[in-house]
């Protein structure tokens, strides 16, 4: 079986990598359509286990962050806690946690454990700035982004994964982030 990354990039290439990049650079809200389109196509090709969905969401988020040139740090360890994504950077997280987001991508059905939650809140005390991506909704003291089809009802604590890039962009705008961005 092909790897999740290979399947993802074949879908992206079918749609048009440059087309996606140009379109979401001009209008970030269009990323919702592309993310949902990619998840739907992926769904037709691969069994959607929690692990597969987690791997897809992780790779797709990395692609979209790069495409939109949003500042991020990926796969870091702080205080013995592995973090998947930090927005915008580690300096901001350390010195101004209210201006930083931690995104954890869960690859099982359990969400994050109480110990993990406790450790993350030591690093990021603002629970609204802890975003957890899962296949289906899970409960916890954080914002939960789900890739589940039909999750159209968004609240402040439960969001659809296809909204994540728009929400990151809005967060950076709200916090007046001026991190250096590469433009293609």
Please describe what each predicted stretch is.
Residues 1-56:
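Interdomain/boundary linker segments immediately adjacent to catalytic/signaling cores
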Residues 33-35, 45-50, 62-67, 90-94:
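A broad, low-specificity signal for short, low-complexity segments enriched in glycine/proline
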Residues 48-49, 70-74, 86-93, 116-120:
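Short secondary-structure capping micro-motifs at structural edges
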Residues 51, 62-84:
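A short acidic/basic microdomain associated with nuclease active sites
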Residues 65, 83-116:
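Conserved catalytic cores of phosphodiester-cleaving nucleases, focusing on short active-site segments
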